[in-house]
Amino acid sequence: MTNRLRDGLLRFLATGLLCVFFNPALSADDQVMIEQQGRSRLPITGEIENFTGRELTMRTRVGKKIRIFPKSEVVEVIASYTQHHDLGRQMLARGRILNATVELNLALNEEDRTWVHREILASLVKCSLWTGDYLTAASDFLKIVASDEETFHYNVAPLAWADDVPDIKLVHEAKLWMSQSSPASKLMGASHLLCSPDSADESESTLRQLSRNSNLRIQRLAQMQLWRSRTMTGASTSGDLTRWEASLEELPQELRAGGYFVLGQAHRKQMNPERSANALLWLPLVYDTDRQLAARACFQAAEQLELIGDHAQAINLFSDMVFRYGDTRWGSLAEVTWKEIRAAHATP
């Protein structure tokens, strides 16, 4: 693993560790930590009226004043949730997806706060991504975007990043998505049709239009989908990869996963196994919302490490995959490969 990757991981972890601890049991109010440029962090208590990709609106406990804070100033949010919502989050964290889905759907039906409604939908998208159910994930994600076009939940956007040809049902749905007026719907449809022989040209044309969209999240994701197109056709150059890596480091955290996957594929095609592994490892280590994609990235990273002779690290990754992603296609492949490598390098 390169120093740059290690430094990036440390910065990412440090951001979380710096968050001030709140104890929600002390108050039924919502609690928010705000950090304005050049000032100390400021705790605010009250009722969150809305929380979008642009701003957080809060009615303070003291004075009942309405205050609005840019999303960029919001460090941490702790709110009270229903019992079903809390249980759903716990089940999701434990990987008990069927239980999580049941609890979260119950929470969805009883929740009347719009911004929390979006939070629950985002968790439901994660449940669907866990099992690779992109159709259900797409349905729930589009509900989020319909409520907030600039949502910060684009980290769960069920876009296609690999070069798999979609099945007939997915092609049908993706064409419907791409025909809608919503930029997010178009983006999702175009991403899944990029590998469909009959729709690839239309998909790429749509992505080029979206790459100039006024919504920066849509714009950046569409641009990374175009990187994917260049990579699949073998048109990407070393200069492209250098620019892409620099662009990724400037992106908001929630948008990086797919870009790192594409970068890893591009380095793999250009026979740069170490750099490919470094890019791919960002997914299982940090950006693992799409569990199926993270599993694939981890498997391919281990393959790349094996190519450069780092057998010990490759074996560790394959071994970890058996326990972490054992229920996925890539986890099963990892178990077979792990045993083969161990046997090949066993001491007589």
Identify the meaning behind each predicted range.
Residues 27-173, 187-195, 249, 265, ...:
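Compositionally biased alpha-helical segments
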Residues 79, 116, 153, 181-185, ...:
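Structural signature of alpha-solenoid helical repeat junctions
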Residues 103-105, 134-145, 168-181, 200-212, ...:
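Alpha-helical repeat scaffolds
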Residues 111, 148-149, 181, 214, ...:
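Alpha-helical junction/boundary sensor with strong preference for TPR arrays
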Residues 313-348:
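Terminal, low-structured helical/coil segments at or just beyond the last alpha-helical repeat
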